[in-house]
Every structure is written in C-alpha cells, then in structure tokens.
C-alpha cells in the first residue's frame, strides 16, 4: 500500500519539511490539517508567504530584513552609532531587542563561515561589514555570533578585521542560563562560564 496521498500533498509535505524542526510526520499532520480544517487559513498562509517573498528585502546598511531601503533600527536617530553588534541572523536581532538592554546598531551576517560547506567571508557580507567599519564612527564592535565552532571561527575572523582598524572588540558572554543547575550543564558551556567569570558585586 502506498504511503502517498496525492502528488500535490506530497509536494506540500516536502515544502513544509524545509521549516526548522519539522520532520516528515509533523509536516504530514500540518499539511492534512490545512487541507481538512483550515482551507481559508491555508489560502491566507499562501498569500502571506507570496507577499513576504515579494516585499521583504535586505537593509542596505545592516542586511536585516525590511521592506524599505533601510530597516527601522538603521533609520532610528535614537540608536547609538558608536556601538555595532554583529549577529548571524534576524532572529538574533529580535532576541537581543527583546532584552531592552541594547541601544546600538546591528550588522546581520545571514549565516556564518563554513569552509566545509563552501561558505566564505564574501558569502556572509564580511566585505560590506569591513566597509561599514571603515566609514562609520564605531568605537565598539560586539560579536554576538552563536557559540558553535562556526560561530566562534566567524567571530575570530571578524575580530582580526576590527583590530586591524583599531576598533575595540567584545564578545557576548556564554555560560549558565538563569535558573540552570550546574549538574545539568554540559562541560563546554561550563568551561565558557568559568573562563568568562567576573568580580561579584
């Protein structure tokens, strides 16, 4: 007995599997739910995806997603031009903005260095970042790439560029999450936490 329903449903399931964290079973449930119960919402979803693909582009300054030449953060006169935070994705910008602890500007790499995957500096906009650093009044560069092998390699690569331009570089701290228990923390995270310790006030 075939596990397929129709070619159109199979195609929908394949496309839904492109979403992060969505496997075959979840994609199948989502597809069938859209077709069984929420056809109106499914049509709205299709329109919203098409609309986003048409209207959303990259900010000409920071590479974040926007619908104009500049994103709202780059347009804002209230942001501190002296501080630039480098992140891997627009999701990281949203996460930092939700803390309300940062008032500087951003540069979104849209990825990280990964030679094994053929992703080099030019693929993530490092040349554009260097030009921005040369032309702006940045006095601190914050590296907020992910604490992965690729994220660390990307941070080191960008740090060398900034240091050549005499721009001070800092790295966001990595360590134990608030409410976490030491016995449940992996050794790599615990090592970062110990190395990044600071005086207790």
Curated annotation (Swiss-Prot):
<keyword id="KW-0863">Zinc-finger</keyword>
<dbReference type="InterPro" id="IPR006171">
    <property type="entry name" value="TOPRIM_dom"/>
</dbReference>
<keyword id="KW-0233">DNA recombination</keyword>
<dbReference type="Pfam" id="PF21176">
    <property type="entry name" value="RecR_HhH"/>
</dbReference>
<feature type="zinc finger region" description="C4-type">
    <location>
        <begin position="59"/>
        <end position="74"/>
    </location>
</feature>
<comment type="function">
    <text>May play a role in DNA repair. It seems to be involved in an RecBC-independent recombinational process of DNA repair. It may act with RecF and RecO.</text>
</comment>
<keyword id="KW-0479">Metal-binding</keyword>
<dbReference type="InterPro" id="IPR015967">
    <property type="entry name" value="Rcmb_RecR_Znf"/>
</dbReference>
<protein>
    <recommendedName>
        <fullName>Recombination protein RecR</fullName>
    </recommendedName>
</protein>
<dbReference type="Pfam" id="PF02132">
    <property type="entry name" value="RecR_ZnF"/>
</dbReference>
<dbReference type="InterPro" id="IPR034137">
    <property type="entry name" value="TOPRIM_RecR"/>
</dbReference>
<keyword id="KW-0234">DNA repair</keyword>
<dbReference type="Pfam" id="PF13662">
    <property type="entry name" value="Toprim_4"/>
</dbReference>
<keyword id="KW-0227">DNA damage</keyword>
<comment type="similarity">
    <text>Belongs to the RecR family.</text>
</comment>
<dbReference type="GO" id="GO:0003677">
    <property type="term" value="F:DNA binding"/>
</dbReference>
<dbReference type="GO" id="GO:0006281">
    <property type="term" value="P:DNA repair"/>
</dbReference>
<dbReference type="InterPro" id="IPR023627">
    <property type="entry name" value="Rcmb_RecR"/>
</dbReference>
<keyword id="KW-0862">Zinc</keyword>
<dbReference type="Pfam" id="PF21175">
    <property type="entry name" value="RecR_C"/>
</dbReference>
<feature type="domain" description="Toprim">
    <location>
        <begin position="82"/>
        <end position="177"/>
    </location>
</feature>
<dbReference type="InterPro" id="IPR000093">
    <property type="entry name" value="DNA_Rcmb_RecR"/>
</dbReference>
<dbReference type="GO" id="GO:0006310">
    <property type="term" value="P:DNA recombination"/>
</dbReference>
<dbReference type="GO" id="GO:0008270">
    <property type="term" value="F:zinc ion binding"/>
</dbReference>
